[in-house]
């Protein structure tokens, strides 16, 4: 590493660097990021792709006054390093350390927290309008990827920005990827723009030549009237300019000179500007350049060997994908939908085997849910695989388009519960609370991976709205047998016991088993453990029996307490006059920050030791 990065103590110092020093700084950042993220894990390929752009932004703007919003925010590592967080980068995504996304409480340079996609244009427009109303003239910049631009919220914002003529700069970071390869009409359109790069060079070359003479300038002014027609011929449908944005592109996102030139022009233009840069995910690390999907998000790895794929342990996502293929082979009405996450949700092989029955809609959860509703209305059996945190974006569609009509759409909520290092924007701890109040909705959760298979088979013949929630990763080493069959609304006694009954959902049954074993060893008391396969509806018959037999009851869930499973059980037990103690174990009314799940469960009293301590207090 050279001395350039080492000597930067204030981002304003970057403005004084010459072009060669800027290029050296970019290389220093790449070297630092590759070394650091290989040790901590984190978002890798996307960050390597925006380093040159980040350096150019600091050269042209003063972020003690100007504003920048990174859409999704996973590509903000270089920005964090240059804004005083380099020495803390070894704590990235660790409990108490740096967040992997922009966070307003972490730095004065993080102007808006992000984590989910497609939000930057709306927030940037809001900031630009606030600047205008407050009499300020600071620049507002939004950096958004071509994947995030497929999100409906981003398109809504573009429509409004073009109409209102907000004074902001949009930088389209076009790497032809979100996590996986982009799909859809907008991706096709951007590809046409990339193919039409010759138009922009042709326009520049002609303009430069004509500017050299007075006659040429008059000719240039006349030719400018033909600009729209030329665009229609050479570059199909200049969408951005048609809706009111000044378009600059295509710009090489790894050429600092080009970036400086276009940014120096854009910052002096009033009104909305979009700069279309083309970058390469994984730039500077050959293995990531060749396989950007594999290097999107990584665990710690050896730089010489690269990321090694792990095939030894089963997990919920891969099991879901395997079972979906089995269902589809036996039932030609089964279809799978994902919102730009075929690999993460385990549907990659399904896509290969059933391409006509697989639908990747891009980053468009709202569309995905109502698409599924339309399919269900015509007799298909749609399964929408989505991370729990991202289903929040389609609340109205689940309620309005699925539940009101009681359509048999199956929502497969991957990453339900804690996801760990991605932090508060990604923890899947709200789905029980926002789905439970919806009439006609049924919510289930497998207690182990093997039970996932049984539930999916049952779900394929369930004729009403259904949500299946399951966690990231695999099982704890607990000996559990899956249910042999599913009986609607009924729970399962996993272990007989006395005095205290634990009613747990999903993987929390495994935590309960370990806690109960500790009680057995320390107190020689058996704890009754119940697997609440059905989160909604609750098993009232079994609860009546527990109350009649005088059990103290502890509910356990990896969801927030408010509006959760435990509150539903508590409400019913109060209705029937249950006289013994009731304890609900869940996440309290707060957002759960980033860190390893084991640490976060412990801090929140939901690990086996915390559950054991609660049980001891009740004995």
Curated annotation (Swiss-Prot):
Q: What is its EC number?
A: 2.2.1.7
Q: What is the lineage of its organism?
A: Bacteria, Bacillati, Bacillota, Clostridia, Eubacteriales
What is the disulfide pattern of this chain? none
Subunit structure, per the record?
Homodimer.
- Top-rank taxon: Bacteria
Which gene underlies this protein? dxs
InterPro entries (UniProt xref): Dxylulose-5-P_synthase (IPR005477), THDP-binding (IPR029061), Transketo_C/PFOR_II (IPR009014), Transketolase-like_Pyr-bd (IPR005475), Transketolase_BS (IPR020826), Transketolase_C (IPR033248), Transketolase_CS (IPR049557)
State what this protein does: Catalyzes the acyloin condensation reaction between C atoms 2 and 3 of pyruvate and glyceraldehyde 3-phosphate to yield 1-deoxy-D-xylulose-5-phosphate (DXP).
- This protein's species is Clostridium perfringens (strain 13 / Type A)
Q: What is the official name of this protein in its record? A: 1-deoxy-D-xylulose-5-phosphate synthase
The protein's enzyme class: transferase
Q: Which GO terms describe its biological process?
A: 1-deoxy-D-xylulose 5-phosphate biosynthetic process; isopentenyl diphosphate biosynthetic process, methylerythritol 4-phosphate pathway; terpenoid biosynthetic process; thiamine biosynthetic process
Where does the secretion signal sit in this chain? none
* Keywords annotated in UniProt: Isoprene biosynthesis, Magnesium, Metal-binding, Thiamine biosynthesis, Thiamine pyrophosphate, Transferase
Cite the NCBIfam families for this sequence.
dxs, PRK05444.2-2
Please tell me whether the keyword Transport is annotated for this protein: no
The Gene Ontology terms for molecular function here are: 1-deoxy-D-xylulose-5-phosphate synthase activity; magnesium ion binding; thiamine pyrophosphate binding
